[in-house]
């Protein structure tokens, strides 16, 4: 199973927290000390916590679970999308719209509209419209794709959230908490770990660190999915006999 070593984390700068004046005292158990007024995260804690989170994500996916990757700040946005797509999962990487989970019924209607517009743009409907109407629909399509494109094929609520930056994505975490959906999150020294079921103390800004987390999670998910497919194949083989 995919795991991440202390050396990988050091190389990626996972141990660099935020400036000491911005700290959240709830993160004290995970802080090793401070250097040049910057908190240093204790990787002796992070390594096992991250690997435990990976094992749990693997379990969820091997039971056909769906993972929603969430990272809407600019530095993480592209990497979040790439990681989710690389393991056939789902993502929100621009803006978290309030109610995305807790008001799924309404979100589902918006997804239906997005799919209708996609069909119209491909089957020649747009060509039959006035220039102004076609432009308006194209803009609507782009806007919906931007906010819902990563979840349009999710088909229901996810089974877990993997979040980059617990502080930035606190609304998503709160919604998941309300629905009992487990939250796995990268929590930096300035963030509140409350509401996160699997806390991964680490730098949430450095792109190398973010890429490291996402790469490991995507690899774990791919492994979990192949276990699921293998057990499905075994079942159908037994039935065929």
Swiss-Prot record:
| Keyword Ribonucleoprotein part of the UniProt annotation | yes
Quick check: keyword Oxidoreductase in the entry? Answer: no
GO molecular function terms listed in the Swiss-Prot or TrEMBL record? structural constituent of ribosome
Task: Extract the PROSITE patterns matched here.
Answer: RIBOSOMAL_S2_1, RIBOSOMAL_S2_2
Q: Which domain of life is it from?
A: Bacteria
Q: GO cellular-component terms in the record? A: cytosolic small ribosomal subunit
- Spell out the InterPro entries in the cross-references: Ribosomal_uS2 (IPR001865), Ribosomal_uS2_bac/mit/plastid (IPR005706), Ribosomal_uS2_CS (IPR018130), Ribosomal_uS2_flav_dom_sf (IPR023591)
Q: Which Pfam families match?
A: Ribosomal_S2
Q: Which UniProt keywords apply?
A: Ribonucleoprotein, Ribosomal protein
Any one GO biological process: translation
Q: Which HAMAP family match?
A: Ribosomal_uS2_B (MF_00291_B)
As for family, the record states: Belongs to the universal ribosomal protein uS2 family.
Under PANTHER family, the record lists: 30S RIBOSOMAL PROTEIN S2 PROKARYOTIC AND ORGANELLAR, SMALL RIBOSOMAL SUBUNIT PROTEIN US2M
Name of protein: Small ribosomal subunit protein uS2
């Amino acid at each position: 199973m995919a795991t991440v070593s202390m050396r990988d984390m050091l190389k990626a700068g996972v141990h660099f927290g935020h400036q000491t004046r911005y700290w959240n005292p709830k993160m004290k158990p995970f802080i090793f000390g401070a250097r040049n007024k910057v908190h240093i995260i204790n990787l002796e804690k992070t390594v096992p916590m991250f690997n435990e989170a990976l094992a749990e994500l693997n379990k969820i996916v091997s039971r056909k679970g769906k993972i929603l990757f969430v990272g809407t700040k600019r530095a993480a946005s592209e990497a979040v999308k790439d990681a989710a797509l690389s393991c056939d999962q789902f993502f929100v990487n621009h803006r978290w719209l309030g109610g995305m989970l807790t008001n799924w019924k309404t979100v589902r209607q918006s997804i239906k509209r997005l799919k209708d517009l996609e069909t119209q743009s491909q089957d020649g409907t747009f060509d039959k419209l006035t220039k102004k109407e076609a432009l308006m629909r194209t803009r609507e399509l782009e806007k919906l794709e931007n906010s819902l494109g990563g979840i349009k094929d999710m088909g229901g609520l996810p089974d877990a959230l993997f979040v980059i930056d617990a502080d930035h994505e606190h609304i998503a975490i709160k919604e998941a908490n309300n629905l009992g959906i487990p939250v796995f999150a990268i929590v930096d020294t300035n963030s509140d770990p409350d509401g996160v079921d699997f806390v991964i103390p680490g730098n949430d800004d450095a792109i190398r660190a973010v890429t490291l987390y996402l790469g490991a999670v995507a690899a774990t998910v791919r492994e979990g999915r192949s276990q699921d497919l293998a057990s499905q194949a075994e079942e159908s083989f037994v039935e065929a006999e």
